[in-house]
Protein backbone atom coordinates (compact mmCIF):
# COMPACT_ATOMS: atom_id res chain seq x y z
CA UNK A 1 0.00 0.00 0.00
CA UNK A 2 2.81 2.39 0.86
CA UNK A 3 4.44 1.65 -2.49
CA UNK A 4 1.22 2.51 -4.32
CA UNK A 5 0.87 5.79 -2.47
CA UNK A 6 4.51 6.62 -3.15
CA UNK A 7 4.01 6.06 -6.87
CA UNK A 8 0.80 8.05 -6.95
CA UNK A 9 1.13 11.41 -5.16
CA UNK A 10 -2.33 12.45 -6.37
CA UNK A 11 -3.81 9.61 -4.34
CA UNK A 12 -1.86 10.80 -1.31
CA UNK A 13 -3.46 14.20 -1.72
CA UNK A 14 -6.90 12.64 -1.95
CA UNK A 15 -6.37 10.57 1.19
CA UNK A 16 -5.07 13.63 3.04
CA UNK A 17 -7.96 15.76 1.83
CA UNK A 18 -10.61 13.25 2.83
CA UNK A 19 -9.13 11.26 5.75
CA UNK A 20 -12.41 10.85 7.59
CA UNK A 21 -14.33 9.90 4.47
CA UNK A 22 -11.71 7.37 3.45
CA UNK A 23 -11.57 5.91 6.93
CA UNK A 24 -15.32 5.56 7.23
CA UNK A 25 -16.35 4.61 3.70
CA UNK A 26 -14.85 1.14 3.55
CA UNK A 27 -16.31 -0.32 6.75
CA UNK A 28 -19.64 1.42 6.15
CA UNK A 29 -19.80 -0.03 2.65
CA UNK A 30 -18.91 -3.47 3.92
CA UNK A 31 -21.52 -3.19 6.66
CA UNK A 32 -24.16 -2.02 4.19
CA UNK A 33 -23.42 -4.92 1.87
CA UNK A 34 -23.71 -7.39 4.75
CA UNK A 35 -27.01 -5.89 5.87
CA UNK A 36 -28.19 -5.85 2.27
CA UNK A 37 -27.53 -9.54 1.89
CA UNK A 38 -29.35 -10.29 5.14
CA UNK A 39 -32.50 -8.42 4.16
CA UNK A 40 -32.43 -9.51 0.54
CA UNK A 41 -31.36 -6.24 -1.10
CA UNK A 42 -29.63 -6.65 -4.43
CA UNK A 43 -26.58 -4.39 -4.81
CA UNK A 44 -26.07 -2.39 -7.99
CA UNK A 45 -22.68 -1.23 -9.23
CA UNK A 46 -22.70 1.52 -11.81
CA UNK A 47 -20.62 0.73 -14.87
CA UNK A 48 -20.19 4.34 -15.98
CA UNK A 49 -19.99 7.59 -13.99
CA UNK A 50 -22.32 10.48 -14.74
CA UNK A 51 -20.59 13.59 -16.02
CA UNK A 52 -22.55 16.86 -15.89
CA UNK A 53 -25.02 17.91 -18.60
CA UNK A 54 -23.13 19.83 -21.26
CA UNK A 55 -19.94 17.81 -20.89
CA UNK A 56 -20.75 15.83 -24.07
CA UNK A 57 -19.02 12.66 -22.91
CA UNK A 58 -16.87 11.36 -20.09
CA UNK A 59 -13.87 11.48 -22.42
CA UNK A 60 -14.40 15.13 -23.34
CA UNK A 61 -14.98 16.02 -19.71
CA UNK A 62 -11.85 14.21 -18.50
CA UNK A 63 -9.71 15.89 -21.15
CA UNK A 64 -10.83 19.44 -20.36
CA UNK A 65 -11.74 19.49 -16.67
CA UNK A 66 -9.07 20.88 -14.32
CA UNK A 67 -11.01 20.03 -11.15
CA UNK A 68 -11.26 23.73 -10.29
CA UNK A 69 -14.69 23.06 -8.70
CA UNK A 70 -16.78 26.22 -9.23
CA UNK A 71 -19.48 23.87 -10.52
CA UNK A 72 -19.27 21.82 -7.33
CA UNK A 73 -19.43 24.80 -4.97
CA UNK A 74 -22.22 26.54 -6.91
CA UNK A 75 -24.44 23.51 -7.61
CA UNK A 76 -27.74 24.42 -5.90
CA UNK A 77 -28.76 20.77 -5.54
CA UNK A 78 -25.38 19.54 -4.27
CA UNK A 79 -25.34 16.90 -6.99
CA UNK A 80 -21.79 17.47 -8.21
CA UNK A 81 -19.12 15.95 -5.99
CA UNK A 82 -15.34 15.54 -6.38
CA UNK A 83 -14.76 12.05 -7.75
CA UNK A 84 -12.40 9.48 -6.36
CA UNK A 85 -11.92 6.64 -8.83
CA UNK A 86 -15.18 6.85 -10.77
CA UNK A 87 -13.31 8.14 -13.84
CA UNK A 88 -10.14 6.20 -13.09
CA UNK A 89 -6.90 7.50 -11.61
CA UNK A 90 -6.56 10.19 -14.29
CA UNK A 91 -9.89 11.74 -13.34
CA UNK A 92 -9.45 11.99 -9.58
CA UNK A 93 -11.29 15.00 -8.10
CA UNK A 94 -13.09 15.81 -11.35
CA UNK A 95 -16.78 16.41 -10.56
CA UNK A 96 -19.19 13.51 -10.86
CA UNK A 97 -22.96 13.45 -10.41
CA UNK A 98 -23.97 11.82 -7.14
CA UNK A 99 -27.59 11.51 -6.04
CA UNK A 100 -27.05 10.81 -2.36
CA UNK A 101 -27.92 14.35 -1.26
CA UNK A 102 -29.95 15.70 -4.16
CA UNK A 103 -30.79 15.46 -7.84
CA UNK A 104 -30.13 17.58 -10.91
CA UNK A 105 -32.82 20.22 -11.29
CA UNK A 106 -34.53 19.78 -14.65
CA UNK A 107 -34.24 23.48 -15.50
CA UNK A 108 -30.83 24.25 -13.97
CA UNK A 109 -27.91 25.01 -16.32
CA UNK A 110 -25.66 26.82 -13.85
CA UNK A 111 -22.65 24.50 -14.13
CA UNK A 112 -22.60 24.93 -17.91
CA UNK A 113 -22.64 28.71 -17.48
CA UNK A 114 -19.70 28.97 -15.09
CA UNK A 115 -17.24 26.33 -16.34
CA UNK A 116 -14.08 28.25 -17.37
CA UNK A 117 -12.43 25.42 -19.30
CA UNK A 118 -15.14 24.27 -21.72
CA UNK A 119 -15.31 20.93 -19.94
CA UNK A 120 -19.02 21.71 -19.55
CA UNK A 121 -20.33 23.57 -22.59
CA UNK A 122 -23.18 26.10 -22.32
CA UNK A 123 -26.67 24.60 -22.54
CA UNK A 124 -30.05 26.25 -22.82
CA UNK A 125 -32.85 24.81 -20.72
CA UNK A 126 -34.41 23.40 -23.88
CA UNK A 127 -31.15 21.71 -24.88
CA UNK A 128 -30.71 20.27 -21.41
CA UNK A 129 -34.23 18.82 -21.51
CA UNK A 130 -33.16 16.82 -24.56
CA UNK A 131 -29.78 15.71 -23.22
CA UNK A 132 -29.51 12.24 -21.72
CA UNK A 133 -26.52 11.99 -19.37
CA UNK A 134 -27.69 8.59 -18.10
CA UNK A 135 -30.62 6.21 -18.04
CA UNK A 136 -32.81 4.68 -15.39
CA UNK A 137 -32.37 1.12 -14.10
CA UNK A 138 -35.03 -0.56 -11.93
CA UNK A 139 -34.40 -3.52 -9.61
CA UNK A 140 -37.84 -4.89 -8.81
CA UNK A 141 -36.67 -7.25 -6.08
CA UNK A 142 -35.43 -4.25 -4.06
CA UNK A 143 -38.65 -2.23 -4.40
CA UNK A 144 -40.78 -2.00 -1.25
CA UNK A 145 -43.87 -2.59 -3.36
CA UNK A 146 -42.44 -6.04 -4.06
CA UNK A 147 -40.80 -6.75 -0.71
CA UNK A 148 -43.29 -5.14 1.71
CA UNK A 149 -46.53 -5.20 -0.28
CA UNK A 150 -46.98 -1.46 0.21
CA UNK A 151 -47.55 1.40 -2.20
CA UNK A 152 -44.82 3.94 -2.84
CA UNK A 153 -44.45 5.72 -6.18
CA UNK A 154 -41.95 8.36 -4.99
CA UNK A 155 -39.74 7.74 -8.01
CA UNK A 156 -42.55 8.32 -10.51
CA UNK A 157 -43.66 11.48 -8.70
CA UNK A 158 -40.19 13.00 -9.09
CA UNK A 159 -39.60 12.06 -12.74
CA UNK A 160 -39.89 15.13 -15.03
CA UNK A 161 -40.10 13.12 -18.27
CA UNK A 162 -42.37 10.22 -17.25
CA UNK A 163 -39.52 7.79 -17.77
CA UNK A 164 -40.83 6.22 -14.55
CA UNK A 165 -44.55 5.55 -14.27
CA UNK A 166 -46.65 3.36 -11.99
CA UNK A 167 -48.51 0.37 -13.40
CA UNK A 168 -50.82 -2.25 -11.82
CA UNK A 169 -48.93 -4.92 -9.91
CA UNK A 170 -50.89 -7.17 -7.53
CA UNK A 171 -53.42 -6.89 -4.72
CA UNK A 172 -54.35 -3.40 -5.85
CA UNK A 173 -50.75 -2.18 -5.71
CA UNK A 174 -48.84 -0.33 -8.41
CA UNK A 175 -45.14 -0.72 -9.20
CA UNK A 176 -42.66 1.37 -11.20
CA UNK A 177 -42.30 0.79 -14.92
CA UNK A 178 -39.34 2.43 -16.65
CA UNK A 179 -38.74 3.79 -20.12
CA UNK A 180 -34.97 4.41 -20.31
CA UNK A 181 -35.28 5.96 -23.78
CA UNK A 182 -36.93 9.12 -22.43
CA UNK A 183 -34.91 9.34 -19.21
CA UNK A 184 -32.54 12.32 -19.02
CA UNK A 185 -30.59 11.02 -16.01
CA UNK A 186 -31.54 13.77 -13.55
CA UNK A 187 -31.47 11.33 -10.63
CA UNK A 188 -34.71 12.43 -9.00
CA UNK A 189 -35.92 8.85 -8.80
CA UNK A 190 -32.68 7.54 -7.30
CA UNK A 191 -32.51 10.33 -4.74
CA UNK A 192 -36.02 9.83 -3.36
CA UNK A 193 -36.05 6.02 -3.37
CA UNK A 194 -36.52 5.04 0.31
CA UNK A 195 -34.94 1.59 0.05
CA UNK A 196 -31.69 1.05 1.95
CA UNK A 197 -28.94 0.00 1.88
CA UNK A 198 -29.36 -0.59 -1.86
CA UNK A 199 -31.94 1.46 -3.70
CA UNK A 200 -34.47 -0.06 -6.05
CA UNK A 201 -33.84 2.50 -8.79
CA UNK A 202 -30.59 3.91 -10.12
CA UNK A 203 -29.21 6.09 -12.88
CA UNK A 204 -26.54 4.47 -15.03
CA UNK A 205 -24.21 6.91 -16.76
CA UNK A 206 -23.93 7.27 -20.53
CA UNK A 207 -20.26 7.38 -21.63
CA UNK A 208 -21.44 9.63 -24.47
CA UNK A 209 -24.42 11.89 -23.79
CA UNK A 210 -27.39 11.29 -26.06
CA UNK A 211 -29.64 13.87 -27.67
Residue locations for each model-derived region?
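Non-ligating segments of multi-cofactor redox enzymes
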Residues: 1-211
